């Protein structure tokens, strides 16, 4: 269909067609005409596109390439479809950067925050849009004000885990000045911090504990015991109470070859996802565990990077994996 034919279609039909396109294709359509750009960048289309993307969440892989030209490599793939982790013919994407290393934060509504010291970049892996900034205060996108606002937290602390977003709040594990583990909550609307009491003193974010999304709830989980296969968790319920849960995973020691794996959380199927904490010569492996069937599946990430340097410690000095990433039209 050429541009002239597309322009003659009713706007509702144009939106329906555009909803089926990838973010990369949508970027090209913003250059076709002002009308297309107006539709794609409109608030209604943003909401429709995001709602559709939520039905097919992805795993997002972010790797810092350390050989040759310094760059970030992104790859997204459907997380709940067979064959396991179907890439749907999407190719890895590389972004060249001058910094030696960027650390990515948990994606929120299709956007990720890349940090390197005081430098911050807001990036959309789909259309490859980004917005760099060297300030680290509060910034509200789309508010019309486009300004940073400084705020204070009465509890001095240092973030030590990834950030989770739930119902307008940001949750993250932290360490106090006295090296005590804390669970912090930041309300995006009120821009206020609060401290959530942890279930007990054994929860230490510097000693094998992590913050995860467990079936839509905030939870703290310890690394799986290599010998017993026990995954110990505390889950925060809707009443603000911590509930203890222990999941024993069969054949864990044989499957992991005595390696330590991080529990990353759950996906829509209810499966638990794990990734190795360290890797040297072998490619990182993702494990999926189904509590109902007791089935533990393996997937090697090497298969996704065939056209890039080998996925090992000498080629990439940091690999991060995020669950439930969705496509969005922000930053187009």
From Swiss-Prot:
Q: Which residues form a coiled coil?
A: none
Tell me where in this chain the F-box domain is found.
3-52
Q: Which Pfam families match?
A: F-box, FBA_3
Q: Which domain of life is it from?
A: Eukaryota
Which protein is depicted? Putative F-box protein At1g70390
Organism from which the protein derives: Arabidopsis thaliana
């Amino acid at each position: 269909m050429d541009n002239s034919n597309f322009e003659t279609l009713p706007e509702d039909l144009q939106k329906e067609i555009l909803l089926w396109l990838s973010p990369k294709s949508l970027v090209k359509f913003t250059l076709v005409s002002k009308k297309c750009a107006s539709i794609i960048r409109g608030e209604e289309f943003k909401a429709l596109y995001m709602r559709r993307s939520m039905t097919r969440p992805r795993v997002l892989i972010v790797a810092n390439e350390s050989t040759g030209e310094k760059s970030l490599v992104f790859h997204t793939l459907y997380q709940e479809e067979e064959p396991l982790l179907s890439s749907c013919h999407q190719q890895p994407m590389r972004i060249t950067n001058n910094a030696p290393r960027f650390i990515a934060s948990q994606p929120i509504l299709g956007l990720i925050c890349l940090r390197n010291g005081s430098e911050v970049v807001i990036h959309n892996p789909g259309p490859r849009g980004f917005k760099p900034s060297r300030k680290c205060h509060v910034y509200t996108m789309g508010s019309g004000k486009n300004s940073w606002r400084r705020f204070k937290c009465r509890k001095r602390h240092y973030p030590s885990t990834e950030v989770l977003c739930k119902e307008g709040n940001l949750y993250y594990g932290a360490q106090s000045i006295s090296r005590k583990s804390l669970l912090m909550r930041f309300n995006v609307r009120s821009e206020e911090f609060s401290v959530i009491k942890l279930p007990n003193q054994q929860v230490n974010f510097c000693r094998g504990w992590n913050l995860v999304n467990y079936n839509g709830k905030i939870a703290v989980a310890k690394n799986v015991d290599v010998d017993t296969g026990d995954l110990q968790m505390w889950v925060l319920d809707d009443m603000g109470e911590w509930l203890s849960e222990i999941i024993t995973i069969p054949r864990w020691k044989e499957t992991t070859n005595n390696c330590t794996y991080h529990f990353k959380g759950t996906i829509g199927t209810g499966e638990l996802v794990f990734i190795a904490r360290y890797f040297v010569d072998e490619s990182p492996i993702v494990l999926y565990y189904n509590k109902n069937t007791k089935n533990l599946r393996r997937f090697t990430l090497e298969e996704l990077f065939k056209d890039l340097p080998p996925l090992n410690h000498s080629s990439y000095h940091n690999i991060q994996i995020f669950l439930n990433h969705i496509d969005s039209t922000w930053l187009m």
